[in-house]
Amino acid sequence: MIQRVYEQVSKVLQDVYVATDDQRIYEAVEAFGGKAIMTSPNHKSGTDRIQEAYTKIGKPFDVVINIQGDEPFIHESQIETVCRCFDDDNTMIATLGRPFNDSHTFADLENPNSPKVVCDNRGFAMYFSRSVIPYLRGTDKTEWLSSFPYLKHIGLYAYRTRVLQEITALPQSPLEVYY
């Protein structure tokens, strides 16, 4: 799976690294010719792991993109979309969500392994949850997917490097502990 993700990402980005704390993953990446960075097993978040990897790489990038290794169906267009967000100098962090569609069921929506994102009217993420958000009071659950444009969060995060450094220096919030 990691090779598939690596190959998909490499179609769009030049400098691709796998940040891992697992020697087996490191060796697997090197075996298929990829670049891997060993990181501490003690990170509290993937964002902290990415910051460590960025520091170890030692190259000056303006933007760092974290794509989860368990996203084998990531599309080139999704990576390009998140990259274009940074054409605006005011963009500091970007991520993506995709709509739950007609093929999804309420069980898909309830699945805690499928994080949801709620956005404001401008499309800016306000909140992420493994629970169904928002709760549609007064609407039968069988109608929720057709009544609200629920978004599934895609495991892709991008940061301006200075913001990545700033947020990883902050203490962990209570919501991060439980999310």
Language model feature labels by segment:
Residues T20-D21, I74, Y159, Y178:
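A conserved hydrophobic position in a structured secondary element of the catalytic/binding core
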Residues E76-L170:
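Conserved core of the sugar-phosphate nucleotidyltransferase
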Residues M1-T20:
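N-terminal glycine-rich phosphate-binding loop and ensuing alpha1 helix
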Residues Y17, Q23-T81:
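Short phosphate-binding loop-to-helix
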Residues P171-Y179:
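Donor nucleotide-sugar recognition loop
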Residues V16-V18, V64, A94, A125:
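Hydrophobic/aromatic residues located in beta-strands of well-ordered beta-sheets
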Residues L13, K59-F61, D88-I93:
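Short, high-confidence coil segments that cap the C-terminus of an alpha-helix
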